[in-house]
Amino acid sequence: MTSFRTIADDLQFPEGPIAMLDGSVILVEIARGTLTRVRSDGRTEVIATPGGGPNGAAIGPDGACYICNNGGLKFERDPVTGTVRPVGQADDYVTGRIERIDLATGKVERLYDKCGDNKLNGPNDIVFDRDGNMWFTDLGKTRHRDMDRGAVYWAKPDGSEIKQVIQPLMTPNGIGLSPDEKTVYVAETESARLYAFEITGPGTVSMIGFPKSITGGRLVTCDGGYRKFDSLAVEADGKICVATLLTGGITVANP
């Protein structure tokens, strides 16, 4: 196995890493509410503090960083292992949102916090297509007695248009596009299932009818055992790599 080297630690629940051309990595710290840059020598600097729960991140067509902000999570530290994990929505939670952050100035601009009459509950992961539009998941929020049903959205980066593409889903998390951008992949956290949806146009997909599919998507993988799926990325050859919780690894699936 390839050895690993720790570049930076003491990050407060980091997610959404973006490899930059200068060798740095931009990521979010959910528990800290920041967008942070990690230099190759381990130095860190805060780019912006949008607050709430900055989650997935991606560089847009204009060079700005676009953030899925889940609105905030409540965290709990395990008294035995010392690890920190989210245990529900934050006490001061109001709504989820999509934000644009200028990397040069740190200015935070809110683009979307609802789609029609439906508010964004907990946006999680985001990817841009070659036309410069974004696809993102809304995992939703979990409370003591209930949880939201999630969705996938498509939106323009200037804040002018947003569409609900797929709903309902069970905790949709990672999202990615096939190399030819004919397919959008969505990973559900709690079910540990990876689905594929055929893209038919800007913000539209074809849906497989019930009972062949309960989500409308084609099931790509559903490995056995107790695990959960997180963010994903698609390799140049089309393989889908899904961060996998509990087993602590990467699940690689053929399309």
Regions picked out by a protein language model, each given a short descriptive name:
Residues 1-255:
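Sequence-structural signature of mature extracellular/luminal beta-sheet repeat domains
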